[in-house]
Amino acid sequence: MSIISVRNLTFCYEGSFDNIFENVNFTIDTDWRLGFIGRNGRGKTTFLRLLMGDYAYEGSITASVHFDYFPFTVTNESLTAAEILLTVSGIAEYDFWRAERELGLLGVDESVLPRPFATLSNGEKTKLLLAALFLKENNFLLIDEPTNHLDLDGRRLVAKYLKSKRGFILVSHDRAFLDECIDHVLSINRSTIEVIHGNYSSWQREKTRRDDYERGENSRLTAEIANLRNAADRIASWSDKVEATKIGGGPCDRGAIGAKAAKMMRHAKAQESRLEREIEKREALMHDVEYDERLKLHPEPYFRQNLLLSKDLSIFYGDRCVANGISFTLNRGDRIALVGRNGCGKSSLLKLLIGQPIAHTGTLEIGSRLTVSYVPQDMSFLSGSADDFAAESEIDITLFKTILRKLDFKRTQFTKDMSEFSMGQKKKVLLARSLCQRANLYIWDEPLNYIDVISRLQIETLILEYKPTMLFVEHDEAFVNDIATKVCRISLNQ
C-alpha cells in the first residue's frame, strides 16, 4: 500500500487570472477505486493532467506509482489490435494469455486481435486499451470518462471489470456505473475538494444532508442577523436622541443622561460585536452548497394524439442492413428511449426523423406540421461566440444565457470562443438551445454525454415536471429508468 499526497496545490492556465486550484490538500490510497466527480469546468481532467506532469504547478504531488492516462492516444492505428495490446501493456509475447484473459473479462472476442486497430468500434477500442493499461506493472490508472462510447451492456461489463481491479481514479458522470465499481469518492465542490469512503449514492446522501443543514443554518443566521441589526439601529437611534436632550439641561440632568447613554452605547457595541460574529458564521456556510436551480421548458401540445409511427423499419449503412423490424408508436406525452448496442442504427433513426437522408425501408409516418427540437451527438461544429450561436439558432439570447448560468456556466465563459469549451460545456450549449425552443417533440441523441451529475439531475427534474413528448437515445441507466415511459429495443442485425 502507498499513497498519493497533494500538498498546497495551486494551478491556473497561462494567461488566465483565475486559479483552477488554490492551496489544495488531500491524500489518496493507491489501492482505492476512486470515483472523481464535480460539475463541468471544475478541473477534473486538468487535475489528471497535473498528475501526469503535463503542466507546471505550485505545491507538491508525491507518489510512488507511475500514472497512466485513459484514453491512451494510439498514434498508428494501422497496427493490429494484438500489436497495440503488446505495445501499450509492455508484456512479452509468451505472456499474451494474460491479455486474452483480460479481454475475455471485458467481453471482447478474440477475433478482433488480428484486425487493424482502426477497424475496431469505439467500444472495442475502449475495452482493449483498458485491458492493456491494467496489464502494466506498478501503475495507477487515471480513467477519464470511459463510458462515453459504451452502450448499456458495455457499461455493465466495464463496471464489473473495474470492480475487480484496485488502484485507479475514475472520472464519470454515470451514477449507476459509479455505484457499481468505486469504493471512495473525490469530489470537487464549489470551494473545496473532499475525499470520502463509499460510492456515489453514499456521497450524494451525505452531500444532501450537509447542504440541507447549511441551508437551515443559513436561514436561522439570516433571521438572527436581521434581528441584531434592528436592535443595534434602535439603540443607536435612542442614544442619538438622549445626546440631543443633554443640550440645554442642568448639570445633574446631563450627568445622569450621559451615564445612561454610555451604558446603552456599551450595549450597542456588544450587539455590534455579536452581529459581526453571526455574519462570519453565515459567511462560513453555503460555500459548497450546489445551486441546482430549476430549469424551464415550453413544450407545445400537438393537435393529434399520434405523432410518429414506425412499422417494420430497416436502417442501412450503405448496402448493409444494421437494424430491421423497428416498430413503435409515439403518442402525445410519451417519452420513448431507444435502447440497443452501439452501431444498431439508433442515431441514424433519429437523423431520419429530422429529415436527413438515411437509407431505409419500411413504414415511417410523421405527423404534419410537427415541430421538432433536436440535440445531436456531434459537437464539433460549435465555434464562435455564444451570442452568435443564439442569433443563428433564432433563440432568445437572454433566456439562452440564463439557462446556461443555471447549468453552472460562469459569466466569463460567455466571452470565450465555444471551441475552447469543455465537452460537457458544449453539450450544455446544445441542451440550452433545445430548452429555448418551443416544440411538439424533443429528439435528443445521447444528451447526457459529458454532462455532470448535478446537471443531469436538473434535467431529470425538468422533464418530470414539464412532461414533454420525447424520443431519445441515452446509455445512462438511471436516467432511462427515471424518465422513459416506454422503451424501444433495437437489435443489431448480425
Region spans (language model):
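Flexible nucleotide-interacting loop at or near the entrance of a catalytic core
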Residues: 2-4, 213-321
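ABC ATP-binding cassette signature C-motif
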Residues: 1-218, 301-494
